[in-house]
Amino acid sequence: MAASEENSALFPIFILTIMAIPLVPYTMVKLSGALSKKQRTIHCQCLECDRSGKYKRSLFKKISNFSTWSNLTLVLLWVVMIFLIYYTKNMSREAQVFDPFSILGLEPGVTDSEIKKAYRRLSIQYHPDKNPDPEANKYFVEFISKAYQALTDSVSRENFEKYGHPDGRQGFQMGIALPQFLLDIDGASGGILLLWIVGVCILLPLVIAVIYLSRSSKYTGNYVMHQTLSAYYYLMKPSLAPSKVMEVFTKAAEYMEIPVRRTDDEPLQKLFMSVRSELNLDLKNMKQEQAKFWKQHPAIVKTELLIQAQLTRESGVLSPALQGDFRRVLELAPRLLEELLKMAVIPRTAQGHGWLRPAVGVVELSQCIVQAVPLSARKSSGVSSEGISPFLQLPHFSDAVVKKIARKKVKSFQDLQEMRLEDRSELLTQVAGLSATDVEDIEKVLEMMPSITVDITCETEGEEGIQEGDIVTLQAWVTLKRPNGLVGALPHAPYFPFHKEENYWVLLADSVSNNVWFSQKVSFLDEGGAITAASKAISESMEGSGAGVKETNDAVREAIEKVKGGSRLVMGKLQAPAEGTYNLTCFCLCDTWIGCDKKQALKVKVLKRTRAGTRGLVSDEGAIAEEGMEEEDEIEEEDYDDDYESEYSEDEDEKKDMDEKRGSKKANGSVKQKKESSSEESGSEEE
């Protein structure tokens, strides 16, 4: 029984050890991550963003940010750890090793006179005749007397010095660090131990696995339902106009789960009257169009109206119940739009290409939702393909302000950005009638807006020229600069109630055939991850081309410096198409800012497949053909559409207006082509 009690006393130590093995490293990782967080402000500092409250770190927010499940679990485990440490430290002395020298307060090897002197001193303190305390009596009999006997008896002392115990050599004893009730073989401990093992080691993990799998089976890795991806895949069309993307977007299964209450009917009717002009309804048959709109699934109607409330900035009139649904719709929007974009660029054609037109529409819808700008504001105005939408994302700007500054020949958003600070301040105060504080807010937002440049190349590694069927390596450096010097930052989005990171989508596409050859998402917030990815990609590319160690290290070092300077590397592989010249466009589309997209022309010449022995050479006829095609290429460049305009002003009958649209694009694009001549020349150098 004593042995079982001793083993039971070891059970807290066993639990303490098992808990400390994962808990201590995990705590160190959490603390290092918390201490390494940058304190630099990366969000907008204008008054509108400040009033939104999403960046304010109040006491409640600090507590809520700390009170996550992982942090609370961590604190609870440390409380248990501290309790076990205290309990272990104050365990019964019966579990301690018998050491007569330490009991008498002596050092090993002392003389008999010192032993007797120590015994007399302790007897005065603990002897029953001197101290009536029962605990003192017990300690004197069980420890002090035995220790004195072990050290004064010659045989006992010799055994202690040789074997560490007064009784001589002791047998080796092993036990199980389990509670005593589980080691009581006379009772029902066998069944309890069996139930404990089965419950903790088998049933508990099984129940957790079943619950996790039953919930996760409905979702993908991006926490989007499989049903949503299926709907997006089948509803996506190659000719889907940006104005029609909303109809596909609202078909998400997550939005179908938002409850539709009878009390929502009247508020939704009022909201419908406020946003009716943004719903693409036919004005000639308004009654029929309204009836058709309300015949849709109630969840779809509710979702679309709530999104329109965000686009038109009418969320303030929503009832408290609809406010919760409104926040839920916007909370799901970023990841649903990302998956919708992936469904647009997923390989559809025989050549493995996606569709450009719906992809651009998804990005434009994302921009409008984040900036709370109506889709109708994106209608091209002749000078700007984005309409007045870039102006409306600035604080204190409205349609009236845009009309006022347009009288001073500020026709496009680029004109406003390129003005000198003094001229812009004078324009906004004297012409637009804004206050000095309003102008200061506008300047803060303009300093936050990114400027993107793209340097892209396509080549076959280790070969001269690209031949049909080759595996082509695409390499693009996307560089971001802001007037305030930040690289990674959160956008100005005072009407979007959640934190939204800037994401950029790099699309290599053929605007004429509506094909997307390559797509990849780029983020500028994670510099460490970008350095790791760029180093790995450059290293593999250099090693594949047969470069030496020094050349590889130099290339990796150069790539790291570029990443630290605000660039991100985009690399991918694609198969070369049939022989011909392809006028491609590299789109770099931002999903948060309007008017910050970048389009870079890229001309790719694919040569005819030659015999196996001459793969790396360009034939003389090919060189002559290239020289002869230069004049023809110059003519083609004049007609090349380098600016993929927004198409929210199109009607449903798109096929009938296609020829007129192409003609208007050529007319409006002639002036822009001169501005992009440098990019065309850089594209021709990649031939």
From Swiss-Prot:
One of its GO terms (biological process) is protein transport. It is a multi-pass membrane protein. Residues 205-603 form the SEC63 domain. Its main location: endoplasmic reticulum. SUPFAM superfamilies: Chaperone J-domain, E set domains, Sec63 N-terminal domain-like. The chain crosses the membrane at residues 9-29, 66-86, 191-211. CDD domains: DnaJ. Glycans are attached at N90. Disruption phenotype: Male gametophytic lethal due to defect in pollen germination and pollen tube growth. Residues 619-687 are annotated as: Disordered. Residues 623-654 have a biased composition (Acidic residues). Pfam families: DnaJ, Sec63. Residues 1-8, 87-190 are lumenal. Residues 30-65, 212-687 are cytoplasmic. Residues 99-164 form the J domain. Required for integral membrane and secreted preprotein translocation across the endoplasmic reticulum membrane. Interacts with OEP61/TPR7. This is DnaJ protein ERDJ2A.
